């Protein structure tokens, strides 16, 4: 194998005002992407590391475990937090807290969690099926994040299952 074939050159990833030089994003994983794991991944040169999923309501209530989850090391160049919520009010309040306290440079919303304990409550991958609620959450999140020009992304799946495909409609809503 020649040296050109062993090194793939990809353009940086642009997220609003942010530039991720190495366009590799570590997906948020509950119980995995804690500070220590993100630090280990940074040492090996990835680009963007998102915290474990934290619920909007727990942030609003300032639950100690949730506040710990959104802590970042001083050398994390892009502080990225993933928020999960099932109502626009708490998602908005959680993002406002993150913005006002300067706790993140990037926010990701979780509409992709397939865990039954999440989807049976109408959250995660099940939420985009409820287009009015999905729209309200996304619009509220964008409004709050834009108060400090913080880029917002959405993690989602193709749908709840093969009979409930939501990604196209959800992507259009998020884009608009």
List where the protein language model places each region.
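Short, solvent-exposed beta-strand edge segments and adjacent coil->beta transition regions
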Residues: 21-23, 76-80, 153
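Alpha/beta enzyme core
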Residues: 43, 92-123, 127-176
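Glycine-rich, positively charged N-terminal anion/phosphate-binding segment
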Residues: 4-14, 29-105
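Non-catalytic, substrate/partner-engaging modules appended to enzymatic cores
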Residues: 20-21, 39
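Short, structurally constrained coil/turn elements
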Residues: 20, 75, 146-148
